[in-house]
Amino acid sequence: MSMSSRHLHSSIVNPPPPEYINRKKTGRLTNQLQYLEKVVLKALWRHHFSWPFQQPVDAAKLNLPDYYQIIKNPMDLSTIRKRLEYNYYSKALDCIQDFNTMFTNCYIYNKPGDDIVVMSQELEKVFMEKIAEMPHEEIELSVVGNRGVKSRIKISAVAAEVCKKKMVSQKMHRRTFPCPVIAMMPKRTTLVPLSVIRSSTSSHSASSVSKVNKGIKRKADTTTPAVSLIATSCESSPTLSEPKPNKILSGTEKTRSAETSAVDLPDSQHHIHFIKSNQICEQLKHCNNILNEMMSKKHAEYAWPFYKTVIPTSLLDCSDAIKHPMDLATIRDKMENGLYKDTQDFASDVRLMFMNSYKYNPPDNEVVNMARKMQDVFEGMFAKIPDDPLATQSMVERYKTSTEESSSSSSSEQSSSSDSEDERAQHLALLQEQLRAVQEQLKALTETPIFSKIQPKSAVGVYDKYKQWVKCIEPMGKLLKRKKNYDAKKKKLHVSDEEEDVKPMSYDEKRQLSLDINKLPGEKLGRIVHIIQSREPSLKDSNPNEIEIDFETLKQSTLRHLEKYVMVCLRKRPKKPSSIKSLKSKEQLNKEKKQELEKRLRDVSGQLSSAKKPKIQGFLYPMQSIGGPSRLSESSTSSSASDVSNSSDSSSSDSSDSESATFPKNILAKKQTSTNYEVPLLLYYGCFVNKPRTSIPQNGLCIGSQSLAYTTISTIVHPTPMALMPLHPGSTNYTSLQLLLKYGLHVPLIIENPLGNSVLFENYLEVLHPSQIEQTFAIKEECLKPKYKNAKVKTSFCWEVFSKSLATTHVTIKSSSNSFQQFRKAAIAKEERERALKAQELRRLEDSKAGMQEKLSPSLPMETKVHEMQAQTIDEATKGEPTCNPVHEGITEEERNLARMREQERRRREAMAGTIDMYLQSDIMATFEEHLC
C-alpha cells in the first residue's frame, strides 16, 4: 500500500451511529412493533446473508471514503434492534421505513450485479414474506408494573392509517428484485351500505349500524355514505350518541334497527329502493366473486404486486407518472362500502390498475407480464357476467314506447321503422369505429409505456374517453366474441368430420411414403414442410430449415395429403392393394446384396489368384433390361447371386436355396407369349452375366398387371484344355441353374479360356413341362461339366447333345423313367470321382504354397495366416462336396455338414498349433495376481 492510500485510509472518519433513544418520549409498544421485533427481525438476523447488515458500515475499515457522502441516512439491523428494545418507534410504519432505508442504501451504493446486492434481495424477500403475515390493526400495549403485559384496546387515526398504507410489495419499487410468492390477505366480510340513511332525514346517531368483521374494527370513511361502527376510547368523537362505544350490536338488534328505520320511509321509496338494490346487488355479486377469485391463492403467483397500494415515498417519480393509482385493496374497500354503481365502474377501476402498470414499467419487466396474465384472467371472468337487467329493461321500455307511438298512423309507422333501421345501422357503425379506435389506442399504450416522470395529457384523455366509451362497447364486444367462438367451434367440427372420413394409412404405406419423400428434390421439400406445419398445430412453430417428423404422430388427413402431393411430384399412379408390395420392399435389399457380392468376389478372387494356376476372369456388368427396369430381374439376380455369396460361408450354404425357392408362382402362372425379357443373372460355375448380343424390343414389366415373358438362354462356350476353376468356393451346386431352368429365365452364360478360342451359339427355350426341364437340365449338366483328362476339350458330345435338345424342345419326350435314372446316376458318380481327384491335387498344391509363403514371409501377422488357412479349408471342403441333389441316394446333407465342420475344426487346430494366445496368457496372469492378493 502506498503512502497516499495509507494517508487516505487514516483520514476516513466514521460518523456516529444513529440514535436509538427517543428523546421526545413519543415511543410506544404496539402489537405490530412487537411482531417486527420477535418475528421479522429475528428471521432476518438468523439468515445466512444478514452478516453484512448486522452492524453499521465501517468506511475506514472497508476503505470506502465516499460511502457517507453518498448515503446520508445509514441504517443497519443492530440499530433497528436497539430502537425496538428502547421503544423508539411510535408506530410500525416508522420501523418498516428503516428496513426499506437499509435495503435502499445497499442498492444505491453498490452495482446491480454485486454479491451484496443479491444478498440484500434475498433478505428483502424474507422481509416481505414476514410483513404479509403481520396483524392488520395496530393495537397499543402497555406494561403495568411487574405483573406482565396487559393489552388494552386503543385505536387511533394513526393506527387506521397504518392499516391502509402498509406496504406489501417491493416488486413495484425495484425492478431487479425477484418475484416472491406472498401469502394471501385474510378474507373480509362485505360491509352492507346503509342506503336507507341517505333518504331519511333522521339524525346519524339513530341509524349508525353496519356489519363489522369479528376482531377487526375500522375507521369510518368520511367520503362514503355508509356509516361504520367504530370502537374507540373514552376520548373518541362526540358525534356518536351511544353511551357504550365498545359495545357491538348483535345480529337481531341490527336487523331490528334497520327495520324500524325502514318503516318510516314512504311506500314509493320502499319500492324504488328494493328494486334497484336487488338488481345492482345481483350484478355486483358477480364482480365481488371476480375480485375474490383474483385475490385467491390460485393467482397469488402473479397477482401479488397488485394487492396493496404503492407507497409514494419509495418511488419518487411514481406520483408524477401515475395520476390515478389503483390496487386490489382499494377496489375491495370501494366494493365493501358500496361505491360502485354498476359493473362498468368496477371494470374500469380494474383496467386502470393494469394500465398504470403498463405505463410505469418497461415492456420487458416481469411486473408487466404479471399484469397481462392477471388481465387475461379478469377479462375471461368478466365476459361471463350476464347482461345488466336494468339495461335490457330500459331497452324493452324504449321499444314499447316507440311501437306505441308508431302505431298511431300507418304512414308514420313506415317512416319510423325505416328511420329506426337507419339509426340502428348508423349506431352500429359508430360503435364499431369507436371500438376500433379504443383498441388501437390501448395497443399503443401497452406497447409503448411512458417512462417520463410527467404523464402526458394524451394518456389522461385516452383514459377519460375509455371510461365514456366502455359502456357502449361492452355489448358489441360480447357479440363479436360469441360470433368468434361459434366460428371456431364450426371450424373444429369441420376438421373433425374430415378426420373421420380419411382412411387410416397402414405401416407399409407410411414406409413407402417416407421413401418417396426422400426421393423428392430439394425444392419440393419446402412444400412438404408447409403442408405439415399448416395441418399440424404442434409443429406450427418448428424451424422449417430443420424439422424432425414422426409419421406415427401425424394425422391421417395430413398423411393422405402428403401422399397425393408426392404422387403428383413423382408422377406415380395410385397402386392397388396387392401382395406385390413385399417385392417392392425388397428392391433396396437386392441392390445392397448386389454391391456386397461385388465386393466379396473381388476380395476372394484377389486372395486366391496367387494360389491357383488356372485363372478365370469374370466381370459383372450392370443389370439392364431393354424394356425398362424390372423388379423380377432384380429379385432373380439377388436370389441367384446369393447362391454364390452364401456358398462362401459353409454354415449358411443352403440359405440361397430357400431364398430362390420362394419365387412367386402366382406370377409365373400368368405368362403370355407376346413379350420376351432378358434377365441378366449371376450364374453357374462362377461365371458372370454379360449383355446379350441380340436385343428384342419389349415393353416394361408391370408386376401384377402384365405376365412374365418366355425367356431365352444365350450361352457362349469356350473349349478349355485346362481345368475350369470356380471363382467362389462352393459354386459347384446346381441350385441356381435348376431354378433358372425351372422358371424359364434368360441365362446368358460366358466361360472364358486363356487360349482365346470361343464358340457362340444361342438357344431360345420355351417354358417346358417339369419332366422336360429335368431331362434338359441333366443333358446341360453333362455338357457343362469341366474335364481335366486331356489338353483338348471334347466338345463334340456337347454339340450333339445341344443339337438334340434344340430339336426336341418342341416335341414331347417319351423316354422311359428307368433309363433316365440310370443315366443320371452314372453321370453323378463319374463327376464325384473326378472332383475327389481334383480336391486331392488342389490340397497338395495349396499346402506346398502355404509352406513356401510361411518361409518367405515370417513377419506376416499370425491372425492373417489363420484367416487364410480357414478360407482355404472352406474352399477345399466345399469343392470336395457332391452336388446337392434330392434324387441322389448317397451321403445325406446332415452327414456332409458334419464332415465339413470336422474338416474346418481340424484345419483350425493345425493353423493355431504354432500360435500363442497372448490374451489367454494375460488373463491367466491376472487371475494369478488376484489370488495372490
Swiss-Prot record:
One of its GO terms (cellular component) is nucleus. Signal peptide: none annotated. Keywords: Activator, Bromodomain, Chromatin regulator, Coiled coil, Differentiation, Meiosis, Nucleus, Repeat, Spermatogenesis, Transcription, Transcription regulation. The keyword Lyase does not apply. A motif (Nuclear localization signal) lies at residues 214-225. Residues 423-448, 829-917 form a coiled coil. It is found in: Nucleus. Pfam families: BET (PF17035), BRD4_CDT (PF17105), Bromodomain (PF00439). One of its GO terms (biological process) is regulation of RNA splicing. Residues 495-577 form the NET domain. Residues 1-21, 235-263, 398-425, 576-610, 627-662 are annotated as: Disordered. Residues 28-134, 278-385 form the Bromo domain. InterPro entries: BRD4_CDT, Bromo_Brdt_I, Bromo_chromatin_reader, Bromodomain, Bromodomain-like_sf, Bromodomain_CS, NET_dom, NET_sf. SMART domains: BROMO. Residues 404-418, 630-660 have a biased composition (Low complexity). Residues 584-603 have a biased composition (Basic and acidic residues). Belongs to the BET family. Testis-specific chromatin protein that specifically binds histone H4 acetylated at 'Lys-5' and 'Lys-8' (H4K5ac and H4K8ac, respectively) and plays a key role in spermatogenesis. Required in late pachytene spermatocytes: plays a role in meiotic and post-meiotic cells by binding to acetylated histones at the promoter of specific meiotic and post-meiotic genes, facilitating their activation at the appropriate time. In the post-meiotic phase of spermatogenesis, binds to hyperacetylated histones and participates in their general removal from DNA. PANTHER family: BROMODOMAIN TESTIS-SPECIFIC PROTEIN, FALZ-RELATED BROMODOMAIN-CONTAINING PROTEINS. Bromo domains mediate interaction with histones that have acetylated lysine residues at specific positions. Bromo domain 1 mediates binding with histone H4 acetylated at 'Lys-5' and 'Lys-8' (H4K5ac and H4K8ac, respectively). The bromo domains also recognize and bind a subset of butyrylated histones: able to bind histone H4 butyrylated at 'Lys-8' (H4K8ac), while it is not able to bind H4 butyrylated at 'Lys-5' (H4K5ac). This is Bromodomain testis-specific protein. It comes from Xenopus tropicalis (Western clawed frog).
